[in-house]
Amino acid sequence: KASAPPLPPSPIMMQRTGTFMHFEQLPDGSGISASYTAAPADGWTLTSVTPLDHALWTLDTENGYAAVPESIGKLYYADGSEQFNKVYQTYGNYSMAFAGAVKDGSAMLIDWTEPDTALNVHHSRIDSPYAGGSDQLSFSLSMTQRSGAFQMRVLGKGGYVQIAKAYRAAASARGLVRTFAQKAQENPGVTKLYGAATAKPDTMIRSRGSAGYTSHTFAELSQVAQHWNDVLGFDRALMTLGGWIRMGFDNQYPDILPASPEAGGNEGLAALSTQVRDYGWLFGLHDNYQDMYDDAPSFDTKYLMYNKDGRPQTGGVWAGGTPYLMASDKAMEFAYRNLPQVKDLFSPNSYFIDTTFNVPLAVSYAPNVLSRSGDMHWKQTLAGYAQDTFGVFGSEGGVEWAVPYGDYFEGILSKKTQAEPGSHIVPLMELVYGDCVALYPHMSEKIGTNGYN
């Protein structure tokens, strides 16, 4: 304790403003739960609260590293050559809401629940003879809500495997763990994913304003499927068609029906679906409920997401041009319209909705106000509806909030070799949710019909 001359009364102190922290021990005694409430003074707006600042630090001389679920998982080493400050937005470029630190073979875990949370991973040089090392890794946690919470757990001896196992228990308590065994009780068809060969052929390809071309007709894909069954002897497979929709791949969403006339129309697609399912395989179709093209018959600005300045949000540049982005709550109108019709026409037993598990959770402003938490809720609603309608459901990317509602993540394995100097890819997603969801590479890396032999 130290004494000092009393300060004059502060208007801020008198209004009881500030950030108030509360700590309590976790029930199992493994660590602490920390929560805060922020009360900014009148006329002030809360930007962020940083309850952890350069915390859980570890040194190069302590064999230190950080375990972070960037995509499938990554380790950063304290003795890495590069200095950096990496910012991870929860469920943006970050697949699970935790981070781990290891020091001399002893591990700690921090985890949280709010998507409006950002983790900073710092790697800095220390220029001091008293520091005990020359390089330091540390974490900072920033939150933007007026209240928030996180947990810190001491795990004892261990590394990233023990960190993932400890987080599995926390994820289970949040209701995020839904295993294949549990899913199979409601839909036995999910077991057809086990060991299945996966293929995603395109059919109709069209750039905006062009006539386009048919890369494979439904009849040609019927011959491919027959070859896989009769000659190669596939006992299980997942065939998902891209470009089957009315105007071809990535064109005029959300107006997908009828099936591409150039590829064989509704009749040809229905026949292919029946054939593939009769082999005992999974047959799926590629769809999208994020992008809305302004040349689509259903286009209307009332469905769009908006920036703070009132301009509609736009997506990337795809075959159909640059789409606008639909607000996830508004997009459900088209999912409720389209998916029952697709089920009645083609009876797929699997479905793929692009981008849903891949793009960061987004914020939309007036006139369509949507928070990150709201965006997550409606994307979970979309995935759950597709799963209930067709049985097996998958999407691009992979993130833990989707685990109860999705059966496979396409693309997360494509990140397995993308490690920069001073880091290493590790299977954190597989360790936490490996018995809940199948992990696949991106469609561009899958078997093609030209190489099926």
Q: What do the predicted segments below correspond to?
A:
Residues 1-238, 243, 261-263, 275, ...:
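Carbohydrate-recognition beta-sandwich/jelly-roll modules
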Residues 53, 290, 400:
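Residue-level detector of flexible, active-site-proximal loop/helix-junction positions
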Residues 188-336, 344-351, 357-362, 366-368:
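Aromatic-lined carbohydrate-binding/catalytic grooves of carbohydrate-active enzymes
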